[in-house]
Amino acid sequence: TLAAIENGYFRDEGLPEVELTATGEDHLTMDALRSGDIDFGADVKPGMIFEASSKGEQLYILGAMINGLPSTLIGTPDVKSIADLRGKKIGCKEEGGSREVPWIRMLLRKAGIDPDKEVQWVPHAGFGSLDIQKPRLDRGDYQAIGLTGHYKRPEIFDLVREAGFNVLAECTETHPYGLPSRVIATRSDILADYPEQVVKVLKGIIRGYRFARDKKNVERIRHMYLSYDWGKDGFGWGKFDATLLDGQIASAQYLPPDGGVVERGLQDIAEEYKAWGKLPKNFSYEQATRFDFVRQAAQEVDAAYGAPEGY
């Protein structure tokens, strides 16, 4: 989205000035979306939209930002497998669970561990970098944590082991088809009142994704990241060094070039939220999705700039 603004892709669609706001927390994004302070959430956890939809709120997932960003669950030396997490503490970034929590809950459940009764979740664990998490793991704040997708794989696995920890699972291996962790969402009134503008917004976003995916734009993306105020000290949840910035830029490959959501993964998320007790058993992810807009947008971008990566 930032690339779309910087490169004038929204202006190309005849849209008025588009402003990007970094709220810093998903619940703040949701509050702003509900109140009308923002019209689109470009980086929201899908489960939050599901929960709102199940309560009758007219919020919809339009497309994806991230379908399958890597996430590595690591454990202290005494935790050699997911099964060893029974009775242990697991760190997470936010109250209510950060991006990787639904995935970790799936892993626990598969190992026969109740994610609500047999482990303790410790919020505000900080950014998932090894530099930040090593001292917290060493002093026993928790025994497992998810590391950011902005490290190179498989190189990070060796770094984890050299630090004395164990690699317990990797999201891209357990869910190779993708597990959507960040989505684009809006309200029903926006869809009803401004359908053409919705497609134009999505076209701008898709072009921005494709620009970021193009490796020849690495230095321009780096400059954008370093120039923008992300609303959190240290560009993230703490120290964010050059290695992680390189990984952040490289992770653009996980932006979907058609803006679409991996529906199999989205269904996995919905099923975990049901098991979590956050959604009714009869909930269907389709009731909180409107993919027709992003499909039209992708078709128009392909027609104008070339499929599947033209921008």
Report the location of each language-model feature:
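Pocket-lining segment of extracytoplasmic ligand-binding domains
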Residues: 129-233
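A generic alpha-helix surface/boundary motif
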Residues: 4, 45-46, 102, 184-185, ...
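Short, solvent-exposed loop/beta-turn-alpha elements that line the ligand-binding surface or hinge
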Residues: 12-14, 172-176, 251-261
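Secondary-structure end/capping motifs
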Residues: 192-280
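Short, glycine-/small- and polar/acidic-enriched structural segments
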Residues: 1-131, 139-150, 167-171, 177-178
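A generic structural signal for nonpolar/aromatic side chains embedded in well-ordered alpha-helices
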Residues: 4, 52, 156-159, 225, ...
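Conserved C-terminal helix/tail region of periplasmic/extracytoplasmic solute-binding proteins
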Residues: 267-311
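Short linear loop/turn motifs
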Residues: 18-22, 28, 120-123, 239-256, ...
